[in-house]
Amino acid sequence: MTMKTIRFPPLLLALAVGLAVACYWPGLQGNYFLFDDTPNLEQLGVFGGVSDWESFRAFVFGGVSGPTGRPLSLATFLLDDNTWPSQAVWFKPTNLAIHVLCGLLLCWGTLLLLRNFRFEEDEAQWLAVFSSACWLLHPLMVSTTLYIVQRMAQLSTLFVFAGMAGYLHGRLLLPERPRAAYAWMTLSLGLGTLLAVFSKENGALLPLLLLVVEFCLPDQPSRPRPARLWRAVCLWLPSLALLIYLARQIDFSPGIWPRRLFDQPERLWSEARIVWEYLRLLFIPQIEGHGLYQDGYAISRGWLTPWTTLPAALGLLALFGAALWARRRWPLVALAILFFFAGHLLESSVLGLELYFEHRNYLSAGLLFLPLGQGLSFLAKKYKPALALVVGGVALCLLAGFTWQRAQLWQDEDQLLLYWAASNPDSPRAYNAVVAILTVRRQLEQADALLDAANERFPDNAMLNLRRLLQKIFARQASERDFELAGQRLSRQVFDMPAIRSMRMIVDNVLKPDTPLFYKDATLGLIEAMERNTTFSRFPEQKQESAYLKGRLYLAKSAPAEACRQYQYAIGLYADVEPALMMVAEIASAQAFDCALETLALAKKALDQQADRSLRRSRESYESEIIRLREIIDQERQK
């Protein structure tokens, strides 16, 4: 008996899709946004909602993520809502639909791949369905699918899988219809790469991934490879361009990434350990890992610090060598490994990204389960098809069970964040999240005790220092001494982006009408302490933020002259008409009309000096807004 005895791969695929939807269903009820969701989606409401071309252009082409801004991904968020604040439950079903589409495209592409390998049709169908079902039902994909902003990674993967499938379809046509074949391959590669890149930059890997496929495909007289010239232009050239780009990023100088707590060698050492952890989670799945609190991950400071660094690096080299060796004897094993490595090339190598994120496996793991499917095929041929069916079914059910339990955990934000915090005792962000939850629950004594313990454990962490002060400001219990102590610590602590956000939160709360008057002066002193911090200069945006926050505080203190000076200094640092106009509106609202007109002139100057491509709206729209604001200010001034 062979796999031909059982002829229901399409039914199994349909069951896998239905099972995936059922497993993810609890997670769709989680009505909360996480981390990077808000910075990327709050722009929906900046202009009163996306309701016309100007607001559409501003949102879709004004993205802040990556070099491209990822406009295609941003455009899809408009399928779910066109304003902000919004409801997370409106976005998550779209993410799940994309996940299912990715699984179906992966299945189609894998089937076409196996046909290129000249597998028998029945076996190819079973292998394609099983391996793609493993990917579709794997619990590691939950943190990509239910984390709304990771739609960017999903869409990029979707177009990569589509491009691969179209390319492999065209490749099958080469012997009999070469013109159609090259049309399919060229269009699929070009369009797939373009759409994927404008979803997320990982899409640039498509030519390299197809080179990996070509490398692992055996030479077959009846299945000719694409012409050398075509491969050179369409596959080798873009792949080499990507590799050259990465090579140009190599810089082992200390302090190359001022916003990171590691340098480039330390990142590479750490990634060697992290990639093995990814592989462990993929082949030994668990319900929930460390989540998004990875700031406590132990950075490798050398080949033997920690000692696992060198074995991890040597192990990856050995795995890569084994894949090259296995290319002819076990090509699917070689393909799975090399595809995985190629998929991690951008995000797990020399670029200054954060160290660890599960979503980096969403694309990379696409072909990783093919060797497992081939193992089941061996069982079916050597023993009985029923045995292979039972083993494969049990594996898929286990994956589905873990995914369902993980989706249950993702249903409740507090439950999820508390779990992550318990799993990451070395993460300052985890402590900060638990304190926020306890504060919302009005468990203030527990929150204060936890913060005190966290500040003792992480004395150099500016975010936790500012959070402790913020807790006292919330309760209107902060004294001048509290501000002084926080400032003394802040002047020598390691400064980072979470600390910048914490400072803005402090100013927002200090400016509320029921706060003690001395809070404003004390906060100005705190900002000055921050400016004395030696790591402060690493963050150019914080200089403009600092001036802006000072302007707000002086304006609230009824010191319009100094407020005007700080606002205008901030505008010069921003060099952007958008925040400039926002500041003009704030100044005018405080009835400092002379300052508002002076600042409006600076906003006009910023507009004149700004390139069209950097504008979030059309130049005409800004010019009309400046005229409108000037008229309003003049009218108010004359009353």
PLM regions: where:
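C-terminal luminal/periplasmic domains and tails of membrane-associated envelope-modifying transferases
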Residues: 418-639
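Polytopic membrane enzymes that build or remodel cell-surface glycoconjugates and lipids
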Residues: 2-472, 476-480, 484-497
